[in-house]
């Protein structure tokens, strides 16, 4: 038996992506709910649990890296503004004890859902290959798992991940992604004026600048000059989609409950999968965020 489960933890307060001001206000409200509850996640969280006869026991993969003190420093001292969305942090692969506490606490609050995929041997081998490469060093000092960032995509060679990117790349590696994942994704263009510090020629962005900007960049302009495009999978959008599908009579995703946590079960064992290695590729274009990552990782 081979299976992979994606657990999704919603944030204490829903994150509003309508515009920069809404994003800032909703994240601040979520932060205020989290201060005395370390198991809560400011913007939500996702993690992967893998079961396969090709590994010993059960493996859980949960990456984190956003330390509150570092976020405050970068926003209020360095004034990087919404550069925080692509900023690179030192990552931590969370222990099973932390994962268990996170799921137990947030489950009591009704903030945990899951999708469990029953998979075949070929899919399991590709997922195992993906995590082997993610955990192994690409030079004498670093492995991809050492770095956390919203713009990182771990199916690009030698890149770290954010928590949702890690989960989505797990599904892609196993050839498990369908159209529903588009409903989990945020698309927006960050105005270049709201990106500061090391990412934009030392530009200083105040919180007031963010709070006074109601809309994302729209219309024309030049990428990297007028705006930076952002595509990111949002745990709260994933959570809402799972909840909606759980409550519907979907023929593909079966509603189930395990250990008191509602979720979806999907049987993908009949998928035709070629090869036993994950589909890693080279990143096609490099932004200022990726340049910083390459420097930190010793890749340039």
List where the protein language model places each region.
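Context-gated lysine
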Residues: 25, 29, 33, 67, ...
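N-terminal capping segments
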Residues: 9-29, 105-160
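Glycine-rich catalytic cores of cysteine/serine-nucleophile enzymes that process amide/ester linkages
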Residues: 6-109, 270-273, 277-284, 290
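Generic detector of leucine side chains in alpha-helical contexts
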Residues: 23, 28-31, 36, 47-50, ...
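A eukaryotic "domain-start" boundary segment
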Residues: 1-4
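Activation targets extended, charge/polar-rich intrinsically disordered C-terminal tails
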Residues: 136-300
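Generic hydrophobic, helix-prone segments enriched in Leu/Val/Ile
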Residues: 6, 48, 125-134, 239-243
């Amino acid at each position: 038996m081979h299976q992979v489960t994606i657990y999704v933890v919603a944030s204490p307060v829903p994150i509003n992506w309508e515009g920069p001001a809404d994003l800032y206000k909703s994240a601040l409200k979520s932060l205020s709910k989290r201060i005395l509850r370390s198991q809560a996640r400011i913007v939500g969280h996702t993690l992967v649990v893998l079961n396969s006869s090709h590994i010993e026991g059960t493996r859980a993969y949960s990456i984190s890296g956003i330390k509150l003190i570092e976020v405050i420093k970068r926003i209020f001292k360095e004034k990087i503004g919404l550069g925080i969305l692509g900023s690179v942090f030192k990552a931590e692969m969370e222990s099973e004890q932390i994962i268990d506490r996170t799921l137990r606490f947030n489950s009591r609050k009704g903030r945990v859902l899951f999708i469990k995929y029953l998979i075949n041997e070929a899919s399991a081998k590709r997922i195992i290959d993906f995590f082997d490469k993610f955990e192994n060093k690409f030079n004498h000092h670093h492995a991809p798992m050492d770095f956390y960032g919203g713009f990182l995509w771990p199916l690009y060679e030698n890149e770290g991940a954010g928590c949702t990117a890690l989960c989505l790349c797990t599904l892609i590696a196993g050839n498990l992604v369908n159209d529903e994942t588009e409903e989990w994704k945020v698309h927006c263009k960050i105005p270049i004026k709201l990106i500061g510090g090391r990412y934009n020629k030392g530009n200083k962005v105040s919180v007031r600048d963010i709070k006074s900007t109601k809309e994302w960049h729209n219309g024309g302009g030049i990428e990297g000059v007028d705006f930076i495009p952002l595509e990111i999978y949002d745990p709260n959008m994933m959570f809402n989609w799972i909840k909606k599908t759980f409550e519907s009579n979907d023929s593909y995703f079966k509603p189930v409950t395990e250990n008191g946590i509602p979720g979806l079960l999907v049987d993908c064992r009949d998928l035709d999968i070629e090869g036993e290695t994950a589909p890693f590729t080279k990143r096609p274009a490099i932004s200022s965020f990726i340049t910083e990552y390459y420097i930190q990782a010793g890749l340039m």
